[in-house]
C-alpha cells in the first residue's frame, strides 16, 4: 500500500477446494478465497484473476460455482479459459500415457505413448478458448456450455458494472504521489476515449455514467 501497488493477478483456477487438492494446487485453497480477496482490497490493490474449466474430476455445476465466486469476491477482470495440457508437464505426460492427448495438427487422438507432446500454437490464437487438447473426463459439450455461461454472465453489462461499483467501495486507496503533467494528460485522454466508447454503446451507457457519477462522489482517489 505504501508503494502504491494498484493491480495484481491471481491464478485462482477453480473455486472447488477438492479439485485443487487433486490437481496438487493446495496453496490456492489455504484460506477462504473471498476473505483473501477482500483483504487485498483493504490495501488498495485491485485484482484480476484466472479461472480454468476442464480439469479431471470437475463436477457438473462448476460454472455456477465460478460465477458465484467471481461475484462474491468482486473480481473485476476475470480471465476464464479452457484447460490446455502443455508440453513437458506432469499433466501432459499422464494424459499421453493414458492415450487421451489430441494431435493439434490432425485433431486425431494420439495412441498411448511416453513421447514428448508437441503443441503447435498458431498465431493470433485466443489462449482462453483454444484449450481442451485432450479427452476430458467430463462431457465436453457441458464444459463448453459452462464456459459460455460464465463469460456471458460475469460480463453482462449490468452485473459487471455493479461488481465494479462494489469493488470500488472496498478499495482503500492512499495517494502518496501526485501524477506528473504528462501522466495526468495521458490519463485524461484515456478517460475521454473510454467515456466515448461507453457512451456510444447503448447497452452499457447508463451503467457507465451511473458508476462514474457515484465514483466521483467518493473522491478523486477512487
Regions found by a protein language model. Give the residues of each.
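A structural motif corresponding to the C-terminal lobe/cap of the Radical SAM core domain
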Residues: 1-187, 199
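Terminal low-complexity segments of carbohydrate-biosynthetic enzymes
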Residues: 175-222
Amino acid at each position: 500500500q505504501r508503494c502504491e501497488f494498484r493491480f495484481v493477478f491471481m491464478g485462482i483456477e477453480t473455486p472447488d477446494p477438492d479439485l485443487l487438492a487433486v490437481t496438487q494446487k493446495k496453496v490456492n485453497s489455504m484460506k477462504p478465497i473471498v476473505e483473501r480477496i477482500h483483504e487485498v482490497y483493504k490495501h488498495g490493490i485491485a485484482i484480476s484473476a484466472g479461472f480454468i474449466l476442464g480439469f479431471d474430476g470437475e463436477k457438473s455445476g462448476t460454472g455456477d460455482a465460478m460465477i458465484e465466486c467471481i461475484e462474491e469476491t468482486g473480481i473485476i477482470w476475470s480471465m476464464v479459459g479452457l484447460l490446455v495440457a502443455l508440453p513437458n508437464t506432469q499433466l501432459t505426460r499422464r494424459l499421453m500415457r493414458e492415450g487421451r492427448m489430441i494431435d493439434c495438427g490432425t485433431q486425431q487422438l494420439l495412441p498411448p505413448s511416453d513421447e514428448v507432446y508437441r503443441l503447435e500454437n498458431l498465431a493470433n490464437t485466443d489462449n482462453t478458448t483454444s484449450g481442451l487438447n485432450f479427452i476430458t473426463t467430463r462431457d465436453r459439450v457441458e464444459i463448453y456450455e459452462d464456459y459460455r455461461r460464465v463469460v456471458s454472465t460475469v460480463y453482462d453489462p449490468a452485473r459487471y458494472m455493479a461488481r465494479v461499483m462494489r469493488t470500488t467501495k472496498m478499495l482503500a486507496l492512499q495517494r502518496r504521489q501526485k501524477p506528473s503533467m504528462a501522466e495526468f494528460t495521458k490519463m485524461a485522454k484515456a478517460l475521454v476515449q473510454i467515456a466515448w466508447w461507453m457512451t456510444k454503446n447503448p447497452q452499457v451507457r447508463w451503467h457507465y455514467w451511473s458508476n462514474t457519477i457515484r465514483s466521483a462522489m467518493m473522491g478523486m482517489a477512487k
